C-alpha cells in the first residue's frame, strides 16, 4: 500500500489489539507492520496470567473487558485463546499482605466477581502441594487463570482482519517520516507508506525508535526468569495459578509440568554492554542465570512447595520496566 490513515508498528498482543480496536470502532484504513512474525518480540514467551482485579478501577474494568472480549472473539472468529480459567490463588505470609488481600476481596465483591477468602487449612485442602505452616490465608478468584499469549495475539489479528485492518509480516519499519513535527509516513523495505497517525507498539524496541524521532520513551528491558520443571506425576490439570507476593513468585500447571516464575524487586538490565536491543532479537532468549534465580527457587521449595525430585530447565525471558 502507498498510503493509509493509521500505521500500527509491532505485531505483538498490544499491536494486534490496537489494530483490532481501531478497525472495530470505525478506523477502517488501518495497517499493522511487523518486522518479523507476529509475537516474535516478547509476546511469545509471556506466562499468560489472566486476572480480573487490578490496582485501580480503570485497570479492573480493562481486565474484565479483555477477558470478556477473548471469550466473545473465540466464538466469532473460530480461533482459540487457550483460556484455562482454573482460578488464581493469592497467598499471604505477612499481616500487611493479608490485610491487602482482604481489601482486594472486598473490591472484587463490589464488581460482582466470584471471590473466596480462605484460611490456611482451606488453602491446604484446595492445593495439597502447598506447605501452609507460615501462611495467614489467601483469596481465590475462581474466574482467573491463564491464556495462551500467542493464541490471543492470533485471535486479535484474525478479528482485526475481519474488521478491515491489514497486517503485514516481514515488514520492518526503517524510518519514521516527520515534517514540521507532524507524521508524514514510514519507510518499509525501501517503500514509502504515507500515513496520518502512528501507533508505536514495539515493546522493548520503543525507546530506540523514539530516540530516532526525538521522542523520549522511558522504557528499558530487563532480564526476567521462569523455570519449567520436568513432568510431575499426578500434578492436577486444574491447579489454580498461585501468586505469592511476599516471596515474589508465582506458579501454574503447564502441560503436566510446573512453571515457576519470579517478579524480582531488582532485575538485571538486559543488553547493558551495548545499551541497545538487537534488531534481529526475534524469539530470543538469554543464557541461564541460576545464581540470580536460585534464592527464589530455594525460598519456594522449602517454604511453600514440597521439593519435587525433578530436574528444572531454566528459561530466561524478558521483562519490560
Give the ranges of each region predicted by the language model:
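Conserved small/polar residues in nucleotide/adenosyl-binding loops
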Residues: 303-310
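Glycine-rich FAD pyrophosphate-binding loop
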Residues: 25-42
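Helix-loop-beta segment of a Rossmann-like dinucleotide-binding subdomain
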Residues: 3, 79-90, 104, 124-163, ...
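Core beta-strand elements of the Rossmann-like FAD/NAD(P) dinucleotide-binding domain
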Residues: 2-4, 189-197
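Central beta-strand plus flanking loop segment that forms part of the substrate or channel wall
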Residues: 47-52, 88-90, 213-237, 295
